[in-house]
Structures are given as C-alpha cells and as structure tokens.
Amino acid sequence: MAPGSTMWLLGYIFLCFPVSFALIKQPKPETPTDPGVLHCRPWNFKFTINFQNQETGSSPVLVTWDNQGRLHRLQNDTDCGTRVGEGPGPSVVLEANYSSCYVTESEPYYVMLVGVEEVDAAGQNLVTKQQLLKCPMHLPAPDAGLCDSVPVQDRLPCATAPISQEDCEELGCCHSSEEVNACYYGNTVTSHCTQEGHFSIAVSRNVSSPPLHLDSVHLVFGNDSECQPVVATRAFVLFLFPFTACGTTRQITGDRAIYENELLATREVRTWSRGSITRDSIFRLRVSCSYSISSSALPVDMHVLTLPPPLPETQPGPLTVVLQIAKDKDYHSYYTMDDYPVVKLLRDPIYVDVSILYRTDPYLGLRLHQCWATPRTNPLYQPQWPILVKGCPYTGDNYQTQLIPVQEAFDLPFPSHHQRFSISTFSFLDSSVAKEALKGPIYLHCSVSVCQPTGTQSCTVTCPIDSRRRNSDINFQNSTANISSKGPMILLQATEDPSEKLHKHSGVPVHPGALWVAGLSGIFIIGALLVSYVAIRTRR
C-alpha cells in the first residue's frame, strides 16, 4: 500500500456494555505601528521596542496579563523571570524567561501578550497598544552533541572574538571558552538574517546520513558569483548573499516583508541499462527572513523549513485495535475481563478509549467513523442509538458525546494511536405505547480505520460536520473489513418505579398470620374494656 493513502485495515470493534486573556474594561488596544524587534533565544524572549511618547513626554510602561486576565506592570522580577532595561536610543528591552509567570505554552509556541500603558489627556492610565510575542518551543539551537562532535580542526568561526556565550548561542552557534574559535558552527544547519539584509546559512556535511557532498550544495535559483559559498571546507559550507539576489522571493504580508530562498544538494546517480541507483541523501532546505517594514532594518524572525523525513516503508501485516472502558476520567486504569459486568446508573459517564496496539510508528493515525449502541451483540440489531456520526458527536442527543483530546505523555508516547470520548449511560425503550425501559446490557460498536500519515486530511475529522452531510444512519463501507469482539457487558441499573419506592419506605414486611393475631388481640382487649365498664356501672 502506498504511503499517504488511507489504510482501511480494521472495521468494527464491539464491546459489551488556549492562550486566553480576560477582557480589560478599557478601549481596545491597537497594534503598534512599530511592532518592535523580537529575538527568540533558547531560554527566553528578548523584545526591543521604541515607544517614547512624543506628545506628552511621559514615559510609557510595558505591561502584561497573567492567565487570570489581571494586568501587571513589567519590571525586574527574579521570581517571575522578567527583566526590563534601557536599549539603544529611546528604546526599551524586555527579557522574559519561557518559565515566566506571564508566558503560556501553546504548542508549539511560547506566547506572551505585552502592552504599552500610557497616560491620556485626562490623566488616566490606558493600555494603548499591544503586541503578541511568539517563539517556537523547540529552537534549532545546537545541543551539546552537535557541538562536541565537531573536531577542533574542522570548527568554522560563527562570529569574531571576543563574543559572550549568550550572544553566540543567540546566533544558534556553539561556544567554547577553551578554544581560539570560541564561537563556531555545530553539526547542523545554522541560519540567521543580518541587519544589513543578508542571508547567512552554514551547512555541515554531517547534517544528513550519509554525509552530504558539500560541493553539490547550491542555491536553487542562483548561478551568479555572489551566490556561491563564501567559505567551503571539508566539513562546512557557508552562504552569505543579499535579499536582492540569487532568486530570493519577496512577499508583503501586513507590516512584514518576508524573503525566501532555497538550498538543494544534487544527488549522484548511477545508471545502466536495467536501472538507476544513488547513495546520496535527499537535502532540500527552504529559509525565510521576516522584517518589519515600518521599523528599523532589524529582522523580526527567521525560519528554517526542511523537508519532512521520508515515510516508513509499508507492508501488509496484522494490526490490532482495542476498545477499552476507563475507570476514571483521567484514563489511569481500565476495566479488565474480570471486572465485568460493570453496573452503571443512568447518566453515569462512560470513558471510552480506542487504540492501536503493539505499534511504534508515529505516522500511524486512528480515525473513528461511526459509533453506536444496540441492546444485543449484533451490530445490525434494532433499535440502535448513534453516538458518533462521521467521527463527530450525534447532535440529536441532549447528552452529547464528548470528544476527549489525547496528549502525549510518558505512558502515552503515540497520541495519534488513540481516540477517546465519553458518553452518558442510557437505557433503550421498547416499541410499545408505554415505552418501557429495556433492562439488560448495552452493546457499543465502532467502525474505525487506520490511516497514514497522521495529521493529514485522511486522518483528521473537523467537528461539527457540514449540516448537509450530517446523517444519523449507520453506513457500512464496502472497503472496510468487519471484525467483532464479544466482550463483557455493561449492565444499566434501571431507575426505581414509584410504587417500588413507596413499598421500599413503608417499613418491614408483615406476615399475614401476624395480622390475624393482632386483630383477635384487639377484639379481646375491646371486649374486656366493655365488661369492666358495665361492671362499674352496675355497682353504682
């Protein structure tokens, strides 16, 4: 089966039984005309902005919001990991650690909302401007292995000495205080945008396996002399070229100008009458620099977009999918065969997990198509009740199914192998006029498919689905194989009938013989009282 296509390997499984900011009550802040310059460091934001108020002469203040929507003035705060200081000229520099009180993790970015508070003509403090700072959570900065693996004789200087370790690492380079070349390139691709409007791209031969032939690395659209590497050694090749040359494209988006170019390594191909081979890696690299048009020429950010790794080879084979019921909403444990039948009251939640077993391929995805319930093991048995329709909660239920996002965790390394949802327990009604509740088990059925690669359109479902396509009927696809598992059942405990409830609270049941004894005793007592009364009257 070809990669990228949906693999309809499994059919039916049967089992018995943001960054959000609070609204501030003040005029809506504007986006500043000068958005400032943001540097995404390996450990923090570095944000430089020129915001001197020329009209009032007052000194505006940088502010931010916590996750409760409360406003805070930014200052030097060790506990919250923020530092505010003067920059060049009339600018202010903010540094905020990614672990700061005001930084939120919004995969795959660290984000922080920053505002400018000024005094208006009436003397009121107002937040007049705001800027959302966003840095990737995983910067392409070299780790220790990429740095230590570069032999001393192969180290290519990344910056001229002297340079601090902080400034060196900000360039994405390695630092060693023991070597002459204290700041050098690691065994990776290191790219940055210069203030003068140039791309700087260093490529290590060990960025791929097998190693690259560096003499084959070139700019896709650049053949001029200025597009050739400025430095070429046996271990590295360095390109330095302006945005106005070498086929660089320019695109204006809002207040930003985005420049892009592409590097490519030519593969050596051997051909004979019966075929062709190559022993070279595929290397294609797209880089982009983003600049603010209205501010200075400092780059706003830099992106290196490499090709995704090739999809794994696929071949036919067994694949196991299981449907389990969790004991709690956190999915810490599941009911086993020995735990059934599981008794549930009406409206009790049932937490369902459908997962692929015994696979470690991160590109596999699991997709739920239809899920429904029947009072028998037969999935075609009537009556039926839809739970998921085309992967989305059935909208005709007043207790709608809740889709539960699956996050990567230590005990859940492949979240794409799982689909989770919760339902509220219910009881089927018979077809009579009285609509009596059917006591007994409820059986849950799902149709699923395993798809590849995860994250593509064939592997994802967007809810709510188009109303024109919404249909509660259960449709079986001819290309889907059907399998069933006769599992244990979930018994639904019926609600008490009012007459049963009255009987339940009327006291301990009385034997009929005891009622006769009590009656005769009462007659004798009444008779004795009458005789005593007559005797007393006679004496008088």
Curated annotation (Swiss-Prot):
Record's protein name: Zona pellucida sperm-binding protein 4
Protein species of origin: Oryctolagus cuniculus
Biological function: Component of the zona pellucida, an extracellular matrix surrounding oocytes which mediates sperm binding, induction of the acrosome reaction and prevents post-fertilization polyspermy. The zona pellucida is composed of 3 to 4 glycoproteins, ZP1, ZP2, ZP3, and ZP4. ZP4 may act as a sperm receptor.
Gene3D superfamilies: Spasmolytic Protein, domain 1, Zona pellucida, ZP-C domain, Zona pellucida, ZP-N domain
Family statement drawn from the similarity comment of this UniProt entry: Belongs to the ZP domain family. ZPB subfamily.
Residue positions with a glycan: N76, N97, N206, N223, S296, T306, N478, N482
UniProt cross-references to InterPro entries, sorted A to Z: P_trefoil_CS, P_trefoil_dom, P_trefoil_dom_sf, Zona_Pellucida_Domain_gp, ZP-C, ZP-C_dom, ZP-N, ZP1/4_Ig-like
PTM section of the record: Proteolytically cleaved before the transmembrane segment to yield the secreted ectodomain incorporated in the zona pellucida.
Gene Ontology annotations for the cellular component aspect, listed alphabetically: egg coat; extracellular region; plasma membrane
Free-text note regarding domains: The ZP domain is involved in the polymerization of the ZP proteins to form the zona pellucida.
Keyword Cell membrane annotated: yes
